[in-house]
Structures are given as structure tokens and as C-alpha cells.
Amino acid sequence: MKSLDLPWIINILSTLSFSNLPHGIIISGPDGIGKKILANAISSRLLINKTTNIENSDLVNSNSHPDYFYLNNEKVLLHNITFRKNKWDDEKGQRNVNDFLSKTPSISINKVAVIVNAQTMNDESQNALLKSLEEPSPNSYIIMITNRPKCLLNTIYSRCQVINIPSLKIDDLNKWLINNGVSDVNALDFPSFTSPLKILEELENNQHLNFKQFIKIITEFIFNNSDTNSTIKNIISLDIDLIMKINYLIEFLKIILKSRLLSEDLSGVFKDFNSSNFNNLKISNLMNELNALRYDYFKVPQINETHILNYFLSELKNSIKI
């Protein structure tokens, strides 16, 4: 997908001063909002051919540009950032960000390294990257992509320009969906944190009903139509990871709490909760617990899903009365 399909990306690009960009850039935003597309567009602008003075976008898009290093690993490790002898392969070598940026550009004015999933770098990897940020080689740029705010060291943030891509408003998201040929779903059918490209991905993979199904499972449990074991089994069977299930549960609590605070009636899959009783503070505290769990999960992902679900289902039943 081209950046022209995403007007909010075009707006961000139009605000950037490419003649005065810092050596470090952090692009932050939810999954599916266009962070990679923005990084690609910025990289193309920076990688002007020093002979023809035009962009080599095709080389960037195909990840075959000699002055472009696109690191797209699920987890960014130390040897991806700096040379580690024990990770060296005599035949293949070991490409890393710091060594790449230290070399003179081949065909472009600049060199650009893009680090996807930068939030997965541990402190040692980030400190190794600081070398290229504190003492950058001439005409070198590092673009880091993260899906969480404030997930890197303060020393990293202090040396970078941060570009936050916010979620779209419901009306803007629906308009974008229609313009892209999607008229049979509404943005309100998805959690508020779901982004445009994520909706398209869920539609393509037939996962667009996951949130509604999750709410139905929770509703059945709270209204005593399903016991704890059956509910846990049904939640685990959903084709989403534990973090997304936590996000869904937080979204559910946000929606019912907001309706109470604003005296608004709920509709759709939430309408049964118009007659429910709950303490606002209890719901707020439960959301705080879930947010804390989500934070801990990123540090220690080996969390027992069944135990987690059992605890929070019990808290839900104690907090929401029918």
C-alpha cells in the first residue's frame, strides 16, 4: 500500500523539514496505523541519488537499496545493533546497524537504517545504539518504529525526534474505509484502538468478528449463562493472543464505565449492560490492574493465561452485578 492511500501520513510528511532532520527519529503509534509506510516514505526522501538527484523509491520498496538497512525482526537483539564475534558467520557475515551506518554511502547522499519493533530492544542493545546517536556518522539516519510510547531509554528519546501517529476519529476512519471499498462494516464494530490497516487485515483474515465474539462470551459469563471453566475455554479458543484479550477486556470496561459517567445508553452487543450495577471505582481499579498486567507481560511474557483469565473473570463477577 502506498503512502498516498493514507492522508494522515501525507499530513505528517508535509510537516517534516528534511533539510533539518535529526540523526535519530522515533515513529510511535498503534499497530496498523502506517508507521512502516511513513518510515519508508521518509527513507525514500533521504536516499536521494547523488548523481541523478532523484529518489530511488523502487530500490527502497524492494529493500535492495545499498544505502538502506531495513531491520524487521520480531525481536531486535544486540548483534543486530553492533558487531558480536560469537555471532559472526565467515560465509554470510553479520550485518548490524552500527557498522552499516559507519560506512560511506554508495549511491545516495545519505544512509538510513530502519529498526522495526524497536520496543523489543533490551537496555544493552539500546546503549549500543546510542553510539550511533551520540556520535553519528555524517549523513546517517536511524528510524526506530515502536508500538508503545515511552518504551525506550530516556537517553534514546533525548537524541531523537519523536513522531506520534494518533488513532483516527471514528468519522474519519469510516470515511477512509468507504474510500477504500469497505462499506459493510462500521468502525464502531471494532475496539477504539483498532487502526485502519488492522481493520483491513482482520477483514482479509476473517477475524473482524473477534471483538464481538469476545464481548458475547463475557456477557454470557456475567449473566450466569456460562461457568468460569467454559468461559476460559471459549476465550482461549479465540484466534488472538493474550495481550489482545487483555486489550479487549480493558475496552469493554472503558465502554460500560463511559456510558455510566456520561449517562448514555449502551447499544449493540453492550445493550444488556444498561441494567447492570457496578461501582465506578471498582471498574477503574480493575482497568488499572489490567494495564499493569499488560506492562508486566512485555517484560515477562511467560504468564499463565488460564490463571490470569480465572482471576479477572472472578473480579468481573464481583464487580458487575445483574
Locations of regions flagged by a protein language model:
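Charged, glycine-rich active-site and insertion segments that engage polyanionic ligands
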Residues: M1-N61, P138-S140, N147-I322
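Conserved beta-strand scaffold positions in the cores of enzyme catalytic domains, especially
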Residues: Y68-Y70, V162
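Residues immediately C-terminal
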Residues: T120-M121, E135, C151
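Conserved D-loop-proximal element of ABC-family nucleotide-binding domains
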Residues: D123-E124, N154
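Hydrophobic residues in beta-strands of the RecA-like P-loop NTPase core, especially within AAA+ ATPase
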Residues: I27, I115, L129-L130, T146
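Conserved alpha-helical scaffold flanking the Walker A/P-loop in AAA+ ATPase domains
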Residues: I12-F18, T82-V112, T120, K131
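A short hydrophobic beta-strand->loop->alpha-helix junction that borders the nucleotide-binding pocket
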Residues: S28-G29, Y70-K75
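Conserved catalytic/switch belt of AAA+ P-loop NTPases
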Residues: S102, N127-M144
